[in-house]
Regions:
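Non-catalytic tandem-repeat scaffold regions and their flanking low-complexity/translocation tails
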Residues: 2, 9-185
């Protein structure tokens, strides 16, 4: 048979355990945030340009998204900090290129605006040093070994030997490399 003091002690320990778990859960949430609102910017340290870092080292990008707001009939542009940006971006050397691409000293990225903010996808096989946009084309980029259409590598197209066919407006119509012809859509 247990007495009241033992039950109270068990309840106190259970309550302490619950509070400890709650604190740990909050720490995890704070360390793995998908986004922070602008009012929470004091939790971040500005690195350079649009990039910020949290105390645990998570990289955030300051961006905008269009959101529905209660009582407003149209979408409202809201500024926030996106924590879903690739964590290996080098903010000190990151630069947006013409079109939907960007690069830093280590990698190249597909980088385009969406209604939810900037979409940033690392192009795993891209060589950052030789990566560049095809002149006047926001969808196409090349490095020394690959041709990219957005995030897709165009197979069997050699960027060193390809011929670019454009229409009267300067838009790419075809890429020809050896026996391979890529027809743009």
């Amino acid at each position: 048979m247990t007495n009241c003091n033992e039950k109270r002690q068990d309840n106190d320990q259970s309550s302490e355990q619950h509070n400890d778990n709650k604190i740990k859960t909050e720490e995890i949430k704070q360390n793995d945030l998908a986004q922070l609102e602008l009012k929470d910017s004091s939790l971040l340290t500005h690195i350079k340009g649009q990039f910020y870092e949290s105390k645990p080292g998570q990289l955030f990008e300051r961006t905008f998204s269009d959101r529905e707001m209660k009582g407003v009939d149209t979408l409202v542009s809201v500024e926030y900090f996106n924590g879903k940006t690739p964590q290996d971006i080098d903010p000190l050397t990151f630069k947006q290129l013409d079109g939907w691409f960007a690069k830093d000293k280590n990698s190249a990225y597909y980088y385009r605006p969406t209604s939810g903010g900037m979409l940033t996808i690392k192009l795993e096989k891209a060589d950052s040093k030789s990566f560049k946009i095809l002149t006047g084309q926001y969808l196409y980029a090349v490095d020394y070994k690959h041709v990219f259409r957005e995030t897709e590598i165009l197979e069997n197209i050699n960027p060193q030997k390809m011929k670019i066919i454009k229409d009267n407006d300067g838009k790419i119509v075809k890429l020809i490399s050896g026996q391979t012809t890529y027809i743009a859509d």
